[in-house]
Amino acid sequence: MKKVNLIIASLLSWAIMSVSALAVDIIVVSHGQANDPFWSVAKNGVDKGCKDMKISCKYTAPATFDMVEMAKLIDNAVSQKPKGIVITLPDAAALGKSVKAAISAGIPVISMNSGSDDYMKLGISAHVGQTEFEAGVGGGQKMKAAGGKKALCVNHEVGNVALDRRCAG
């Protein structure tokens, strides 16, 4: 939890450095719903980081894992002209057009969690997260060290390219 809060605070700090106004509006568009056990920690980190830094933030996510809906949420965020947008990037091909529209509008974009392999190709300013393939390799090594001989990687979000890469590791 502390690590997630630190990552979110770092993301927000970086976004703030690129704008001059005191009242900063940051929109977070995630593929993970705030009621999911993992993503609730991330949302709480966003909320705490924004409160601590005295900025306004909005966390949005599709009701289910849905790249078309997520692209619409990014487009909607762009139309609100925030000072910065933080996104997850589970599928660069599906979200690329929307991300590039944000950047073309002069809005700083940072990715978190997923997207380490693709964020630079889209022009995203920075990424906070692990490289997916290497994370999968590390997970496999830990399982082997614990005595595991076989593994099954289940991708619970069909279409999440980042998880496909992790399973490949």
Q: How should these model regions be labeled?
A:
Residues 6-12:
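Sec-dependent N-terminal signal peptides
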Residues 2-5, 16, 21-169:
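A residue-level marker of the well-folded mature domains of exported/periplasmic proteins
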